[in-house]
């Protein structure tokens, strides 16, 4: 890069653990983005007060201190990067980089260096450890010589972090020369007073600034009393209690539901809160849109004038979701995202769709897509590799819907299914306006109708782009030999493709003669004197036979009952892809087959129960099924509220 340097796999150290990401150091400052989206650190060059290098195990750590006292630590630089970046900081920012050394002697006595809001424990001239005073929640004097620092403990944590720092004790003898005391004010008291003057100790207190009772939260599900304190928010429910520091709040979303008296308010967190083994990066709240509240903020006049005068008012009266968002924004400093220019066919802000096995609504926003309510899925435009519009392979009522596949640069895919067909013009126009790559309509863009050429094709024999793409990807990996490790039930019909098991009709599953390549009959010798017209006639006859065979499929036939393995595959496939990025199509089937084979009868029971219920459903539907006469399929002008 001529303007700076770009590095991948650089971790940011923080109270919630380490987060990998990408850092850009350029003439305007420093920009770090977390891998997979979430937290972003943007430091302007005018805010940089100092830069340090430290050699840590296996790599190098870059420390950047800014004007407000914060210190960011970026780890993962090579030795050759140290030289190039040191010269860059000197030549571009005019900053001389300081080199720090890490103490590895194991001594627990030394001196304390207080700089900004950082406390560094020094052993000789080397640093043993460093903590941020912004994370200190309380200080206590124990006896005459001991000071205990208590750190903020909340329910946010890194995905791989099991432990967090709760408290630390310092022993300051009366003979200490750095913090000199007297008989009435010992050295430990001098040290504690110094910490309290630098740390934001006690901010937030025990009293809430404002409380919202009986708020419905969809993720994590429950009804909670939401308390907004000065430095954190608390969710108090009957079974759960979450405390969340405002430093973990990345962004707020205010998204109305179309034709329904509810509004979503989403709090995006980094790091997320944890409940058991489940991480919740998004708190999804649902407010009644027409509810009006009158709230007074419990903030002292002095504190309000000194810190919050430009951010908050002392009293609010208005719609509950607007009051909640305004107060939370003022306290946390988080930005609020609202719906942008997209409008559905009913002039709403979202479209109905399904993700995995869950029905919900998809919000196309100015810089992202957001699927709600469960599982809440945020997809940033900058992380998208391409999108595909996919028509359903079956006919009948399914022709009123299409799917939207979003593939990320990380090769992860999100398939939003069963979107009403009369929404595709709005979606196509919106996606095109954002400059996102659309894979399967590059040729159709130049023709009249554009995406309509793909989605409005009523030919039941048309190719499903998603299914065809999966087959093409799998074709290069499949071998001629049968995989003996892949053992399934006789009626499974093989490993299903992504999300295909729930949507294919009975005709498409049972039509083995049309799915398998037909055996080629030996060609008969043709007379050299045969006219070309006879050859064309013969070819036409062959094509006619093939088309007649294809028409044996009935798109209106009931969906065939799925086996227990098919239900198991649908549940496990996405998890398998997440834990094994880049796994091939055939390996997915093999691993799922092995997992199914190793399950006990008790573990298979819930899947077999679903299979029995589906079998009964199929039996009931097929018993009353009659092959209908051909009929015209309506283009689909009806629409449900998004």
From Swiss-Prot:
Keywords noted in UniProt: Chromosome, DNA damage, DNA repair, DNA replication, DNA-binding, Nucleus, Transcription, Transcription regulation
Biased composition (Acidic residues): 475-486
GO term, biological process aspect, one: DNA replication
Pfam family, one: PH1_SSRP1-like
GO MF annotations in UniProt: DNA binding; histone binding; nucleosome binding
Segments of this protein annotated with the region Disordered: 470-566, 598-642
Regions of compositional bias (Basic and acidic residues) in chain numbering: 513-527, 598-623
Keyword Nucleus: yes
Key word DNA repair present: yes
Location in or out of the cell: Nucleus; Chromosome
CDD domains: HMG-box_AtSSRP1, PH1_SSRP1-like, PH2_SSRP1-like
Residues of the DNA-binding region: 558-626
Biased composition (Polar residues): 629-642
Gene Ontology CC: one annotated term: FACT complex
Family: Belongs to the SSRP1 family.
Function summary: Component of the FACT complex, a general chromatin factor that acts to reorganize nucleosomes. The FACT complex is involved in multiple processes that require DNA as a template such as mRNA elongation, DNA replication and DNA repair. During transcription elongation the FACT complex acts as a histone chaperone that both destabilizes and restores nucleosomal structure.
Subunit organization: Component of the FACT complex, a stable heterodimer of SPT16 and SSRP1.
Protein known as: FACT complex subunit SSRP1
Organism: Vicia faba (Broad bean)
Gene: SSRP1
């Amino acid at each position: 890069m001529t303007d700076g340097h770009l590095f991948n796999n650089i971790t940011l150290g923080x109270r919630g653990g380490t987060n990998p990401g990408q850092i850009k150091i350029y003439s305007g400052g420093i920009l770090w983005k977390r891998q997979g989206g979430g937290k972003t650190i943007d430091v302007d060059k005018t805010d940089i007060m100092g830069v340090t290098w430290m050699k840590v195990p296996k790599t190098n750590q870059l420390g950047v201190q800014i004007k407000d006292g914060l210190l960011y630590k970026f780890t993962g630089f090579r030795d050759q990067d140290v030289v190039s970046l040191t010269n860059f900081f000197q030549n571009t920012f005019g900053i001389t980089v300081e080199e720090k050394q890490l103490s590895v002697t194991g001594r627990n006595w030394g001196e304390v260096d207080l700089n900004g809001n950082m406390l560094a424990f020094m052993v000789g001239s080397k640093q043993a450890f460093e903590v941020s005073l912004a994370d200190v929640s309380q200080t206590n004097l124990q006896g005459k010589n001991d000071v205990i620092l208590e750190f903020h403990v909340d329910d946010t944590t890194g995905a791989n972090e099991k432990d967090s720092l709760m408290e630390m004790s310092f022993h300051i003898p009366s003979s200490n020369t750095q913090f000199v005391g007297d008989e009435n004010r010992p050295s430990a008291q001098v040290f504690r007073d110094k910490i309290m003057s630098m740390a934001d100790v006690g901010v937030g207190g025990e009293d809430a600034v404002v409380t919202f009772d009986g708020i419905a939260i969809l993720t994590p599900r429950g009804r909670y009393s939401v308390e907004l304190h000065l430095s954190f928010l608390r969710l108090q429910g009957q079974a759960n209690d979450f405390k969340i520091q405002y430093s973990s709040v990345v962004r707020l979303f205010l998204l109305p539901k179309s034709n329904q008296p509810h509004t979503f308010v989403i709090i995006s967190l980094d790091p997320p809160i944890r409940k058991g083994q489940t991480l919740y990066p998004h708190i999804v709240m649902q407010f009644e849109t027409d509810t009006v509240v009158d709230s007074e903020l419990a903030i002292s006049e002095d504190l309000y004038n000194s810190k919050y005068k430009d951010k908050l008012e002392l009293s609010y009266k208005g719609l509950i979701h607007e009051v909640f968002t305004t107060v939370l924004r003022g306290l946390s400093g988080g930005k609020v995202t609202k719906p942008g220019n997209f409008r559905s066919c009913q002039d709403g802000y979202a479209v109905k769709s399904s993700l995995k096995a869950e029905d919900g609504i998809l919000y196309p926003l100015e810089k992202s897509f957001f699927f709600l309510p469960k599982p809440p899925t945020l997809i940033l435009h900058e992380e998208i590799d391409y999108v595909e519009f996919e028509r359903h392979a079956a006919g009948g009522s399914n022709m009123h819907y299409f799917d939207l596949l979003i593939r990320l640069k990380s090769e992860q895919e999100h398939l939003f299914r069963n979107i009403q067909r009369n929404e595709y013009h709005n979606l196509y126009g919106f996606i095109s306006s954002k400059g996102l790559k659309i894979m399967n309509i590059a040729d159709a863009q130049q023709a009249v109708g554009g995406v309509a050429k793909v989605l409005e094709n009523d030919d039941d024999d048309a190719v499903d782009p998603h299914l065809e793409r999966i087959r093409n990807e799998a074709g290069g990996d499949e071998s001629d030999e049968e995989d003996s490790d892949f053992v399934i039930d006789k009626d499974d019909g093989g490993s299903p493709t992504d999300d295909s098991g729930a949507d294919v009709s009975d005709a498409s599953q049972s039509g083995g003669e049309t799915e398998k390549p037909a055996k080629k009959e030996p060609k008969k010798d043709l007379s050299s004197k045969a006219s070309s017209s006879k050859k064309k006639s013969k070819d036409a006859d062959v094509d006619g036979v093939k088309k007649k065979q294809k028409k044996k499929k009935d798109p209106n036939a009931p969906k065939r009952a799925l086996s227990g393995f098919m239900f198991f595959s649908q549940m496990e496939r996405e998890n398998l892809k997440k834990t094994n990025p880049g796994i091939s199509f055939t390996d997915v089937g093999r691993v799922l087959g092995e997992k199914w084979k190793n399950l006990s009868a008790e573990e298979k029971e819930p899947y077999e129960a679903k299979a029995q219920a589906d079998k009964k459903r199929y039996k009931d539907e097929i018993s009353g099924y009659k092959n209908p006469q051909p009929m015209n399929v309506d283009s689909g002008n009806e629409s449900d509220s998004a």
